[in-house]
A protein has these predicted regions:
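Short C-terminal tail/terminal secondary-structure segment
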Residues: 4, 146, 209, 227, ...
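Substrate-binding pocket helix/loop in short-chain dehydrogenase/reductase
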Residues: 97-98, 102-110, 203, 207
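Residue(s) in the substrate-gating loop at a strand-loop-helix junction
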Residues: 141
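Alpha-helical segment proximal to the catalytic Tyr-Lys
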Residues: 126, 170-174, 235
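Canonical Rossmann dinucleotide-binding motif of NAD(H)/NADP(H)-dependent dehydrogenases/reductases
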Residues: 2-35
Length: 249
């Protein structure tokens, strides 16, 4: 039988990478129990020490695979009976010009940046609609909010993911389900640094100069920014997209 608890239940699709660990900490500090995709065992212990009940679901964080988000949702409902909030980030960063691009590159980007949020939304939306409440946040990219020289395919597909999210929000707003998107760029995390070469201090400085705030974003502050879209304190915003890129958009 599912556990019954007055605490809110949050689902984090990938709790191991990108902002997933910081989002998990944010939820724990705000009194949530958690269903997490592929969390590090040390993170689970930390969250439990903060008072959260943690359900760790293995081998589901790659949400480009259509079955993985559904596995996480099914596990969360089996354990807790429901969930109140769900968040996912995905992506496949392949820079380069349009002229030099290939259909193989486009297919990889679509798989990581459009199919992934599609599968996630298909899994999390129906149970939230059925229960008549819930909050969903899809993390896309600020590159989808403006033309991005050097990343034309990536920018275009990210724009599609953002608009998919906003369209879903319009469909389910009357069911008291909020669905929003936030797009990042210039964030300090390994995949960005590797894809752009910004592990090199000189290259990093070049990127920082493109950001009006003249630095890269931190994951802890980004998790705090995401909180009102997910923690139940603000439930009258849906269908919105916000960039989180230090003023670049």
């Amino acid at each position: 039988m599912p556990e019954t608890t007055p605490r809110r239940i949050a689902l984090v699709a990938d709790a191991r990478h990108y902002v997933g660990p910081e989002l998990s900490r944010m939820f724990a500090r705000r009194g949530h129990d958690l269903a997490l995709g592929d969390p590090d065992p040390e993170l689970v212990a930390e969250l439990e020490a903060l008072g959260s009940t943690v359900l760790a679901v293995e081998k589901v964080s790659n949400i480009a695979k259509p079955e993985n988000s559904q596995k996480l949702v099914d596990a969360a409902i089996a354990r807790f009976g429901h969930f109140d909030a769900a968040v996912a980030a995905s992506g496949q960063i392949i820079p380069g010009s349009f002229i030099d691009s290939s259909i193989d590159q486009l297919e990889k980007i679509v798989d990581g940046c459009l199919y992934a949020p599609y599968h996630f939304l298909k899994a999390v939306i129906p149970p939230l609609v059925a229960q008549g409440s819930g909050q969903v946040l899809v993390i896309t990219s600020a590159a989808g909010a403006r033309p991005t020289p050097g990343a034309s395919l990536y920018s275009s597909v990210r724009a599609g993911a953002t608009m998919l999210t906003r369209n879903v929000a319009g469909e389910v707003a009357r069911k008291n389900v909020q669905v929003n998107a936030v797009g990042t760029n210039f964030m300090d995390f390994p995949e960005f640094l590797e894809a752009t070469g910004a592990n090199d201090p000189a290259v990093r400085e070049m990127f920082e100069k493109q950001v009006p705030m003249r630095r890269l974003g931190r994951m802890d502050e980004f998790a705090s920014f995401c909180a009102p879209f997910l923690d139940g304190t603000s439930t009258f915003t849906t269908g919105q997209y916000v960039s989180y890129a230090g003023g670049w958009v």
